[in-house]
From Swiss-Prot:
Taxonomic classification: Bacteria, Pseudomonadati, Pseudomonadota, Gammaproteobacteria, Pseudomonadales
Family of the protein in this entry: Belongs to the dUTPase family.
Name this polypeptide is given: Deoxyuridine 5'-triphosphate nucleotidohydrolase
Pathway annotation from the record: Pyrimidine metabolism; dUMP biosynthesis; dUMP from dCTP (dUTP route): step 2/2
CC cofactor: Mg(2+)
Protein's organism: Pseudomonas putida (strain ATCC 700007 / DSM 6899 / JCM 31910 / BCRC 17059 / LMG 24140 / F1)
Length: 151
């Protein structure tokens, strides 16, 4: 398991609400909670930025973190991330914020302390461009959207 530096920015985290943790030994994501001042109503079509009360410092350029939606919120209530995926660079040290978007048709209340997203560490390979005049041939070539078949 990789050690991750973290700062608790909201004293309720770790006392009233548990610190992010893996739910099972096979879990990939750490649940992030809505550390709001009060329950917040998210109207259909509305997007709000929600604090998590936590900042992290990854420090290793070979790693990044992604903030992903929780499947149940999206499927059952239409609550997804406003930016679809949040990317946390290894040198970022600010508070983790979650952009929540209600893509559904009914208002949804986000309760203080509710699990709203998940944080997943991922490996990163940094690349540089090697400018060429032509690519080596491949089977696919420049075939794009729909190129490999309709189903």
């Amino acid at each position: 398991m990789h050690a991750l530096q973290a700062k608790i920015l909201d004293p309720r985290l770790g006392s009233e609400f548990p610190l992010p943790a893996y739910a099972t030994p096979g879990s990939a994501g750490l649940d992030l909670r809505a550390l709001l001042k009060e329950d917040t109503l998210l109207e259909p079509g509305q997007t709000i930025l929600i604090p998590t009360g936590l900042s992290i410092y990854i420090g290793d350029p070979g790693l990044a973190a992604v903030i992903l939606p929780r499947s149940g919120l999206g499927h059952k209530h239409g609550i997804v991330l406003g930016n679809l995926v949040g990317l946390i660079d290894s040198d970022y040290q600010g508070e983790l914020m979650v952009s929540c978007w209600n893509r559904g048709n009914t208002p949804f209340t986000i309760a203080v302390g509710e699990r709203i997203a998940q944080l997943v560490l991922v490996p990163v390979v940094q690349a540089h461009f090697d400018i060429v005049e032509a690519f080596d041939e491949s089977q696919r070539g420049a075939g794009g959207f729909g190129h490999s078949g309709s189903h």
